[in-house]
A protein has these predicted regions:
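Hydrophobic ligand-binding cavity/cleft-lining segments
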Residues: 1-55
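Short, exposed beta-strand/loop patches in secreted or surface proteins that constitute
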Residues: 13-15, 57-59, 81-84, 106
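Structural motif
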Residues: 18, 85-87, 109-111
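Glycine-centered tight beta-turn/hairpin loop motif at sheet-sheet or coil-to-beta transitions
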Residues: 19, 73-75, 97-99
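Short beta-edge strand/loop motif at the mouth of beta-sheet-based domains
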Residues: 23-24, 42-79, 88-90, 156-164
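Hydrophobic/aromatic beta-strand elements that line small-molecule binding cavities or substrate pockets
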Residues: 26, 79-84, 101-108
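Beta-strand/loop substructures that line and gate deep hydrophobic ligand-binding cavities in soluble
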Residues: 92-145
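Short, highly charged C-terminal tails/helix-capping segments
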Residues: 145-176
């Protein structure tokens, strides 16, 4: 099965009084429950979400934590707090950037489900300069292969291609 989005590069940034919102929408040819599991179960998240290997734990309740501990040469721990959880349709959690948070909304449709991801940031320009749109794009590009049982590794060449595309749109910094 495969996914289809309105465009292969469909990330957008909306500037708001509070900073901004990065948005993605994916139409996935998988049942909502499978997609929910892929965004909430540690072993599934590890297959597609991060650009590095990590041990992930998820306490899937409001106030619970999602903890990602890098297992590579550079130690790093990212802890997010779960703000809202309404299985299998809504997950909202903080992000590593203070004051920002992410909202995952799933909608069941006849052909699978629609995933709407919104990343609320405090500074849209900083998010653009730090290539948040590109990182989200690349993570989401790995979701369908994961759902198909064929996870793919992070591809830095694909990241560079997406970065060049989004930079032309003013939604990412240019590669240096």
């Amino acid at each position: 099965m495969s996914d289809s989005a309105t465009s292969p590069y469909d990330g957008t940034v909306e500037r708001t009084a509070d900073g901004g919102v990065i948005r993605f929408e994916r139409h996935l040819a998988y049942p909502i429950r499978e997609v929910w599991d892929a965004i909430t179960q540690p072993e599934r998240l590890a297959d597609w979400w991060l650009p590095f290997d990590a041990d992930i734990t998820v306490d899937l309740r409001e106030g619970g934590e999602m903890v990602m501990v890098a297992t590579g040469d550079e130690p790093m721990t990212v802890t997010c707090t779960i703000l809202r959880v309404e299985p299998p349709m809504l997950l909202e959690h903080t992000h590593a950037e203070p004051g920002s948070y992410m909202r995952w909304e799933l909608e069941s449709i006849e052909t699978g489900c629609v995933l709407r991801l919104s990343h609320f940031v405090t500074d849209a320009d900083a998010a653009i300069n730090n290539c948040y749109v590109v990182g989200l794009h690349e993570s989401l590009a790995r979701l369908s292969p994961c759902l198909a049982g064929q996870p793919v590794p992070w591809d830095w060449d694909e990241f560079a291609a997406a970065q060049a595309h989004y930079a032309r749109l003013g939604l990412a910094s240019a590669a240096t």
